[in-house]
């Protein structure tokens, strides 16, 4: 698959041949869903907690005698059916993380990249560098490229001026290539890769 390389100014800078095993797969929604679900589960805090009958601050003594009152048999007022009692089967502090094989995670990333390429939402930029950290200038350049909602992936290190200029632009995320992930790719409209990012990804999936 051949794709045109552009500069930040919108000029052509040649072509690049993309690896079909990374950018030319037929995307599978089930694989993408599994990876996104795994990512969000790892991110979920899990600090929710409700007091059970063993946690509430009430006496554990029997409410009244077993027989002779004509009332229902009860033990402690901590039981869930009473006002001020503990919650039955309430949430507890836990991790929502679950396992996902490394091969499935790698496959998910390749399918996400292929999905963007197939939808013509993949743009290759020659170099992600800015002469000065000016947001206004970068917004103008992005407008020429039609980037209003995009994930921008640079090389192993992002140019400091470019990072600062892009940090104030809404709906634009900038990550180094080692931070690329399925969730961030899918949540943004366009995917922008630098030439260095393409080379790093192809090296990673060799």
UniProtKB/Swiss-Prot annotation:
A molecular function GO annotation: rRNA binding
Composition bias type Basic residues, residue spans: 66-77
SUPFAM superfamilies registered for this protein in UniProt: Ribosomal protein L4
Superkingdom of the organism of origin: Bacteria
Matches recorded under PANTHER family: 50S RIBOSOMAL PROTEIN L4, LARGE RIBOSOMAL SUBUNIT PROTEIN UL4M
Role: One of the primary rRNA binding proteins, this protein initially binds near the 5'-end of the 23S rRNA. It is important during the early stages of 50S assembly. It makes multiple contacts with different domains of the 23S rRNA in the assembled 50S subunit and ribosome. Forms part of the polypeptide exit tunnel.
Quaternary structure and partners: Part of the 50S ribosomal subunit.
Family per similarity comment: Belongs to the universal ribosomal protein uL4 family.
The protein's name: Large ribosomal subunit protein uL4
Species: Brucella anthropi (strain ATCC 49188 / DSM 6882 / CCUG 24695 / JCM 21032 / LMG 3331 / NBRC 15819 / NCTC 12168 / Alc 37) (Ochrobactrum anthropi)
Lineage of the organism: Bacteria, Pseudomonadati, Pseudomonadota, Alphaproteobacteria, Hyphomicrobiales
């Amino acid at each position: 698959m051949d794709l045109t390389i552009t500069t930040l100014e919108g000029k052509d800078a040649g072509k690049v041949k993309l690896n079909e095993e990374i950018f030319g797969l037929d995307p599978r929604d089930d694989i993408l869903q599994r990876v996104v679900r795994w990512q969000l589960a790892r991110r979920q805090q899990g600090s929710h907690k409700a007091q059970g009958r063993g946690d509430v601050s009430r006496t554990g003594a029997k409410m009244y005698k077993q027989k002779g009152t004509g009332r229902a048999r009860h033990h402690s007022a901590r039981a869930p059916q009473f006002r001020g009692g503990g919650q039955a089967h309430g949430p507890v502090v836990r991790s929502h993380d679950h396992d996902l094989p490394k091969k499935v995670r790698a496959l998910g990333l390749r399918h996400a990249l292929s999905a963007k390429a197939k939808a013509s939402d993949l743009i290759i930029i020659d170099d992600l560098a800015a002469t000065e950290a000016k947001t206004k200038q970068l917004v103008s350049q992005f407008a020429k490229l039609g980037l209003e909602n995009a994930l921008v992936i640079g090389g192993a290190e992002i140019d400091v001026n470019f990072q600062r200029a892009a940090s104030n632009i809404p709906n634009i995320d900038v990550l180094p290539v080692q931070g690329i992930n399925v969730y961030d790719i899918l949540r943004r409209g366009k995917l922008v890769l630098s030439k260095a990012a393409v080379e790093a990804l192809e090296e990673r999936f060799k």
